[in-house]
UniProtKB/Swiss-Prot annotation:
Native source organism of the sequence: Mycolicibacterium vanbaalenii (strain DSM 7251 / JCM 13017 / BCRC 16820 / KCTC 9966 / NRRL B-24157 / PYR-1)
UniProt-recorded name of the protein: ECF RNA polymerase sigma factor SigK
Record region (Sigma-70 factor domain-4): 142-191
Gene name per UniProt: sigK
Keywords noted in UniProt: DNA-binding, Sigma factor, Transcription, Transcription regulation
DNA-binding region per UniProt: 164-183
Classification via InterPro entries: RNA_pol_sigma-70-like (IPR039425), RNA_pol_sigma-70_dom (IPR014284), RNA_pol_sigma70_r2 (IPR007627), RNA_pol_sigma70_r4 (IPR007630), RNA_pol_sigma_r2 (IPR013325), RNA_pol_sigma_r3/r4-like (IPR013324), WH-like_DNA-bd_sf (IPR036388)
Family per record: Belongs to the sigma-70 factor family. ECF subfamily.
Signal sequence coordinates: none
Region of interest (Sigma-70 factor domain-2), ranges: 39-105
CDD domains: Sigma70_r4
Length: 196
């Protein structure tokens, strides 16, 4: 790099910082256009940071989405006297990624412990089969009571083993929409099955 390029980049840095600070203050006022501009200018850095921590593209996409949702909800909590908008955002992203790693590790540890200490007692296979058949019929009946889009989302996720992001890709729908359909569908299934 030449010295003039470095000087030009250094001169642009305060402008970018000031621009992001201004955009984040507008986001705090629920300005959707400012949020879109803030997202466009920062998404690559946020996703890159999260991917370096998580090392999984699917979790990274989901965590990035969570970070920007948190930005939208908590932009008013940004204090420019403490640091720049970019450092606030990257700190938020790093914390969220580390939380995700800890959560996954805790879940893995719980599963390992449970698997190590749980021993299946002898059972009556005929009675178990009858109960399973009855439960399958109840679940199938309750699935039929869902809307077509809810049923399709649940079948893709639970019967075909797809992640929410893969379901969104398959159905060409927004991930937030898929999550909403899944939540509503599961709620309806619980109600139908009499599960709290």
């Amino acid at each position: 790099m030449t010295a003039s390029v470095l000087v030009g980049a250094a001169a642009r840095l305060p402008l970018v910082t000031a621009e992001l600070d201004a955009l984040l203050r507008q986001v705090a006022q629920r300005d959707a256009e400012a949020f879109a501009a803030f997202y466009d200018q920062t998404r690559a850095r946020v996703y890159g940071l999260i991917t370096r921590v998580l090392r999984d593209p699917g979790y990274s996409e989901e965590t990035t989405q969570d970070v920007y949702l948190q930005v939208w909800r908590n932009a008013a909590g940004y204090d420019p006297s403490v640091g720049s908008a970019l450092s606030w955002l990257l700190t938020l992203a790093h914390r969220r990624a580390v939380d995700r790693v800890r959560s996954e590790q805790a879940a893995s540890t719980r599963e390992s412990r449970y698997g190590a200490i749980s021993v299946d007692p002898p059972s009556d296979h005929v009675a178990d089969d009858v109960l399973l058949d009855d439960e399958r019929r109840r679940v199938a009946g309750c699935l039929d009571s869902l809307t077509d889009v809810q049923r399709e989302c649940i079948q893709l996720a639970y019967y075909d083993g797809l992640t929410y992001a893969q379901v969104a890709d398959r159905l060409a729908a927004n991930l937030a929409t898929i999550k909403s359909r899944m939540r509503d569908g599961i709620r309806a299934l619980r109600k139908c099955l009499g599960v709290a």
